[in-house]
């Protein structure tokens, strides 16, 4: 594997650990040239369904987009990175369990909201207020009232 620091092509695995949930393997590697260490993660290569946007365009599923939107909603909230990662894992498991080749972006958004609601009610409201594109304050009040119950 190529060293991210110096670009040398020969690195050595110095430590390997399996995650607690056995979903991925963490490896510590050391470069043969600069001797710096770095971490890599290996996970199974699975085919996620394509995401169908509202306008009909199809895009590949992008984990980074889900993580980014969840982190934005959870900004300055008492939720750890590990909890966010676990929530994304749940979303991905549900996506794969659908067994579909294509999933509407609205369905993916609902899965994200479901996980955010479990993690943090404020983050859920933040995400839903943008995702659902409320037309007026009454729609927002209704959402807040639902969450407050």
Swiss-Prot record:
Keywords: ATP-binding, DNA-binding, Metal-binding, Nucleotide-binding, Repressor, Transcription, Transcription regulation, Zinc, Zinc-finger
Ranges in coiled-coil conformation: none
Entry GO MF terms: ATP binding; DNA binding; zinc ion binding
UniProt-listed GO biological process terms: negative regulation of DNA-templated transcription
Zinc finger regions, unnamed: 3-34
Residue ranges constituting the ATP-cone domain according to the UniProt record: 49-139
Co-factor binding details: Binds 1 zinc ion.
Disulfide-linked positions: none
Pfam families with a match to the protein in the record: ATP-cone (PF03477), Zn_ribbon_NrdR (PF22811)
Cofactor(s) listed: Zn(2+)
Protein family per UniProt: Belongs to the NrdR family.
Known role: Negatively regulates transcription of bacterial ribonucleotide reductase nrd genes and operons by binding to NrdR-boxes.
HAMAP family: NrdR
Protein name: Transcriptional repressor NrdR
UniProt source species: Polaromonas naphthalenivorans (strain CJ2)
Gene this chain is encoded by: nrdR
């Amino acid at each position: 594997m190529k060293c991210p620091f110096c670009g040398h092509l020969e690195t050595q695995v110095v430590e390997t650990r399996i995650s607690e949930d056995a979903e991925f393997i963490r490896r510590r590697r050391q470069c043969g040239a600069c001797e710096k260490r770095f971490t890599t993660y290996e996970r199974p290569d699975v085919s996620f369904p394509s995401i169908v946007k509202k306008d009909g365009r199809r895009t590949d599923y992008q984990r980074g987009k889900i993580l980014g939107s969840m982190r934005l909603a959870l900004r300055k909230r008492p939720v750890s990175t590990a909890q966010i990662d676990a929530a994304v894992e749940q979303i991905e498991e549900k996506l794969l369990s659908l067994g579909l080749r294509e999933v509407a972006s609205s369905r993916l958004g609902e899965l994200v909201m479901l996980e955010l609601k479990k993690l943090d009610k404020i983050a859920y409201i933040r995400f839903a207020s943008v995702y659902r594109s409320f037309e007026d304050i009454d729609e927002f009040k209704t959402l807040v009232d639902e969450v407050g119950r």
